[in-house]
């Protein structure tokens, strides 16, 4: 481990302060078709935290709760008869205590990057989203009733678009979650009746961990939903950390943007506040949830601005194309789903790595970018977007210790009397994943101590020497002055 040493004398023990500065930008968007403006989603436990700076990442999972009565990989949900997906075997009570009408499952898996053990990862945040279209005309309500016969018995459920039943790995029963009226969008006649809902489930996912999750009894209708069609499904976003993994800046944001097929105007979504690595390749991962993108209708796209130009690159992943981005595909890293359908009839959940060859899209030390989305033929609604970038997170460590009092070597605990000189040593180490630039240590002198003029010095035990590598006393910094060591770049150690 490389060390940097500074020695100075005062009449009292001095404490080390390493000042790090971060500026986090705000996310915003504005256009005529955004029913609910996109804002950064924060946890109820850390409401001011806009960016998750973690050794870790985010992941996504989810599924559809409606499918075609006559399933086909290429048929859309519009003007077709839809039926409930129900995979839990009617053995577990759902909404209202009766067997579930609709249910589907997906498995939460966490990364094994750099030898990370998923069971040792810590859940930082989990957010549950669900979406559906259950109305065609008139004035829609958040609640409605559906009657269904199961094993010869008739049941009636009073569905609520704000309610969902959720079941974690090993849980005996479903737990009901209720979204706030402001999370996210519940139209009565606009936006093609597509609703989107959200609730934080961090505590629940921490309790049950990795494994299969089921979501059931969403407010959905089966049957023929007309020209747009009925659809419905759910998705879970999880932010987690593991000490083995890379540093990343993770940003989550949601809203409700409705894009109608007749409007070909593109719309922009600026994102700022992350801070990418200073050198080397920048890894970028994107996640998204949307509703009503059809497999058979093309022309819809989602793009990102190139770093060096004002041009945009249309994005795609293994389950879609650049000219049919919203195509009812669920592409979340290969985790298990039940059912595991190619055509999810109006539900898109995507998680994929962006093509960033030679850092052409996101570069080193970049703090903002811009997304653009639009259509030339398909109608859809976006309600959740996630992004992670390889991050620059300085992780220096400073250890302050006294070496002698009045020239006599000492070890802790120390005892000094007024008038004695105390010599301190500051050990600085870089525990991060890359060099720390513009490093400066500022040590305020306590009000009851006096700096011994000319006593501060610095020794560097690596090559090449950093610049400016200057140790000095600044009498104007603080009420009694401060000792400053401005030595420039703190490199990575040769052996951590």
Please describe what each predicted stretch is:
Residues 33-396, 427:
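Disulfide-rich extracellular domains of secreted proteins
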Residues 19, 369, 398-402, 424, ...:
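Polar/charged side chains located within well-ordered beta-strands of beta-rich proteins
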Residues 414-442:
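Short beta-strand elements of extracellular/lumenal beta-sandwich folds
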Residues 289-293, 376, 403-405, 417, ...:
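Short solvent-exposed strand-capping/beta-turn motif centered on an Asx-Ser/Thr pair
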Residues 261-264, 419, 493-496:
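Solvent-exposed, conformationally flexible loop/turn segments
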Residues 390-418, 444-446:
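Low-complexity, acidic Ser/Thr/Pro/Gly-rich terminal tails and inter-domain linkers that flank the onset
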Residues 401-405, 437-440, 444-495:
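A surface/secretory-pathway sequence property marking extracellular, secreted
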Residues 1-35:
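Bacterial Sec-dependent N-terminal signal peptides
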């Amino acid at each position: 481990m490389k060390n940097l040493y500074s020695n100075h004398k005062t009449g009292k023990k001095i404490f080390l302060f390493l000042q790090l500065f971060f500026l986090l930008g705000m996310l915003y968007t504005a256009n005529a078709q955004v029913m609910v403006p996109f804002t950064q989603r924060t946890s109820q436990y850390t409401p001011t935290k806009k960016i998750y700076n973690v050794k870790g990442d985010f992941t996504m999972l989810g599924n559809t709760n409606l499918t075609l009565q006559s399933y086909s990989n290429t048929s859309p949900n519009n003007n077709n008869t839809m039926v409930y997906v129900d995979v839990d075997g009617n053995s577990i009570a759902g909404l209202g205590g009766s067997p579930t009408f609709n249910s589907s499952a997906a498995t939460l898996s966490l990364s094994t990057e750099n030898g990370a053990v998923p069971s040792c990862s810590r859940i930082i945040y989990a957010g549950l989203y669900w979406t559906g279209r259950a109305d065609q005309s008139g004035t829609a309500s958040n609640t409605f009733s559906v009657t269904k016969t199961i094993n010869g018995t008739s049941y009636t459920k009073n569905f609520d678009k704000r309610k969902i039943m959720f079941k974690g790995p090993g849980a005996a029963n479903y737990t009901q979650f209720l979204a706030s009226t402001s999370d996210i969008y519940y139209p009565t006649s606009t936006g093609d009746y597509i609703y989107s809902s959200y609730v934080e489930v961090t505590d629940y996912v921490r309790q049950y961990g990795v494994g299969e999750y089921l979501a059931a009894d969403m407010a959905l209708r089966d049957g023929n939903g007309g020209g747009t069609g009925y659809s419905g499904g759910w998705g879970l976003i999880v932010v987690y950390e593991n000490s083995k993994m890379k540093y990343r800046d993770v940003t989550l944001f949601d809203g409700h943007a409705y894009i109608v097929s007749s409007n070909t105007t593109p719309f922009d979504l600026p994102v700022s506040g992350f801070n990418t690595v200073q050198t080397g390749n920048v890894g970028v991962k994107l996640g998204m949830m949307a509703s009503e993108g059809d497999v058979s209708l093309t022309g819809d796209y989602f793009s990102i601005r190139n770093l060096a130009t004002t041009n945009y690159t249309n994005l795609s992943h293994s389950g879609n194309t650049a000219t049919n981005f919203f195509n009812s595909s669920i592409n979340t890293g290969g985790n298990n789903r039940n059912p595991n359908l190619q055509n999810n009839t109006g539900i898109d959940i995507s998680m994929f790595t962006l093509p960033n060859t030679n850092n052409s899209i996101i570069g080193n030390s970049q703090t903002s970018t811009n997304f653009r989305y639009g259509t030339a033929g398909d109608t859809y609604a976006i309600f959740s977007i996630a992004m992670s970038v390889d991050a620059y997170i300085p992780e220096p460590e400073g250890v302050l210790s006294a070496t002698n009092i009045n020239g006599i070597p000492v070890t802790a605990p120390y005892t000094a009397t007024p008038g004695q000189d105390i010599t301190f040593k500051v050990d600085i180490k870089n525990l991060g994943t890359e060099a720390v630039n513009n490093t400066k240590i500022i040590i305020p002198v306590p009000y009851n101590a006096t700096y011994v003029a000319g006593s501060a010095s610095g020794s560097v035990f690596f090559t090449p020497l950093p610049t400016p590598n200057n140790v000095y006393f600044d009498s104007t910094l603080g009420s009694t002055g401060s000792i400053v060591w401005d030595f420039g770049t703190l490199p990575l150690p040769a052996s951590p």
